[in-house]
Design a protein with these regions (language model features):
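Generic detector of intrinsically disordered, low-complexity, polar/charged segments
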Residues: 1, 17-18, 51, 79, ...
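Extreme N-terminal basic, low-complexity initiation segments
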Residues: 2-8
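Arginine residue identity/basic-tract feature
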Residues: 4, 30-31, 51, 118, ...
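Helicase-associated low-complexity/disordered flanking segments
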Residues: 8-75
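Conserved P-loop/Walker A NTP-binding site and adjacent catalytic elements of P-loop NTPases
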Residues: 60-169
Length: 169
């Protein structure tokens, strides 16, 4: 897992340095891949789409991307602003075991993403972010929610990855 995570981190840095653009890089740490190829599983995917996001159908390549992630495949997605990238990593994170890590350089975007997920959930701990804006007490709350299995999505600022307490966690 560590080697694959470092590959994603390198991809994140490559886009930010060479293309001068900010991108969210999604890394899904999972024990076992899922498959969403049967009709029943496809219906389950659609029902989860409606449950979490209120949509009855995917747009563009979202379903293909999500199925690829659910199968445990590394997936690179390049879509325009408003193309539905966030849903491509949020839905798999919400329906699979474990916590998904999203690297994002923009604190405001992290907050918006977390707020949006929390609006559709009964559990405020379902999504968190770790960045320089948090107090020690808030960081402890985030870590507690992750350790207790309440958090499905964790948005992390790249600079947070260099802190010893984050590395140890």
């Amino acid at each position: 897992l560590e080697c694959r995570f470092l590959s994603f981190l390198k991809l994140f840095l490559f886009f930010n340095i060479f293309f001068g653009c900010f991108v969210d890089i999604y890394y899904l740490c999972r024990r076992a891949p899922l498959s969403a190829t049967t009709t029943m599983e496809k219906n389950n995917l659609i029902s989860n789409l409606k449950r979490y996001f209120g949509f009855t159908a995917f747009k563009g390549q979202q379903e293909e991307v999500i199925n690829n992630l659910l199968k445990g495949n590394d997936t690179f997605v390049l879509m325009p602003t408003g193309g539905g990238k966030s849903l491509c990593y949020q839905l798999p994170a919400l329906i699979m075991e474990g916590t998904a890590i999203v690297l994002s350089p923009l604190i405001a975007l992290m907050k918006n993403q977390v707020d949006a997920i929390r609006q559709v959930s009964e559990n405020d701990g379902i999504a968190h972010y770790l960045n320089s804006s948090l107090t020690k007490a808030q960081v402890d709350e985030v870590k507690n929610d992750i350790q207790n299995g309440r958090t499905k999505l964790l948005y992390v600022a790249p600079e947070s990855l260099t802190k010893e307490e984050t590395k140890e966690f």
